[in-house]
A protein has these predicted regions:
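C-terminal scaffold of the Radical SAM
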Residues: 1-276
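Short amphipathic alpha-helical interaction segments
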Residues: 275-287
């Protein structure tokens, strides 16, 4: 994550070689890699394949150049199509594309064209998000400066309706819904090991500036600025900014909420792992 495709081929090889020295990839089930389409060339994608990336995720978001521009995206549609073409010819195990519903200036017609274009491209997996404006984004700062209190994006009921339409459209095209965000072309062969493991409480070792991690029930975030981050790293310390240790109840509720995103829960899983009967703990939520 964190759009590592901004790194050069040389930097990527150096980084992953050092990672493999610490954590050999010989028996790795999945190596997922997030890309900004405008940063990709055929040479870089070849390097990613040779490094061992199995799941390539392209942050396309939309296929309309105007939408991409007004939302501050660095790439344009031709770069997205080019990246998809290269990725499909290089034989990655799985290619995912991200779409965002309700971006600034987006209309229902645009959204429907975007979904249909994604179907025409035929990726293995499509992940659909709904546009949000976090407080630390450029768009939010511009809103605050202008005295606006409402984000210039589609309202939540509209975004939910568009996502619902998209899921139905993908299912008509032969895709299967695998989570609250994701559709896959072939559920028998298309797996997302990282997501499924994380939603079952697996550790997540985050290394980047401002990144969030989860180790042994402790949630943490690294330093959000490069200066303090490098000061800690150069001195041999851990660049952790804040952390929170969860208890048994919090870990149980966390996993329950995360697995609701799959659209179903397995009571036996929680009974065996936490000794909790979700059917009696959350009867109203599971109705």
């Amino acid at each position: 994550g964190g759009t590592p495709s901004n790194l050069s081929v040389k930097q990527l090889r150096t980084l992953t070689d050092k990672m493999k020295d610490l954590f050999p990839w010989d028996e790795t089930e999945e190596v997922a890699f997030e890309c900004e389409p405008g940063t990709l060339s055929e040479k870089k994608l070849e390097a990613l394949r040779d490094i061992g990336v199995t799941r390539l995720s392209l942050g396309i978001e939309n296929f309309d150049d105007h939408i991409l521009e007004v939302n501050g995206r660095a790439h344009r549609s031709m770069e997205a199509f080019r990246a998809l073409r290269f990725a499909n010819t290089l034989g990655f195990d799985q290619v995912n594309i991200d779409l965002i519903a309700g971006m600034m200036d987006e209309t229902e017609d645009n959204w429907k064209r975007c979904v249909d274009t994604a179907i025409e491209q035929g990726p293995d997996c499509v992940t659909i998000y709904q546009m949000e404006i976090p407080y630390n984004t450029t768009i939010f700062k511009e809103m605050k400066a202008a005295g606006r209190v409402t984000a210039p994006v589609a309202i939540w009921p509209t975004k939910r309706a568009w996502v619902d339409w998209a899921f139905n459209r993908f299912e008509e095209a032969g895709y299967s819904v695998s989570s609250a965000y994701t559709v896959v072309k072939n559920p028998e062969t298309t797996k997302f090991v990282y997501r499924d493991s994380l939603w079952e409480g697996a550790d997540l070792l985050s290394a980047g500036v401002a990144s969030f991690g989860h180790l042994g029930g402790v949630h943490y975030q690294n330093q959000a600025d490069v200066g303090p981050y490098m000061t800690e790293v150069d001195s041999g310390g851990l660049p952790i900014f804040r952390a929170y240790e969860t208890d048994h109840e919090e870990r149980f509720v966390r996993e329950f909420v995360l697995q609701l995103k799959l659209g179903l829960v397995h009571p036996s899983y929680f009974q065996e792992k936490y000794g909790e009967d979700v059917m009696t703990r959350f009867p109203e939520q599971l109705q």
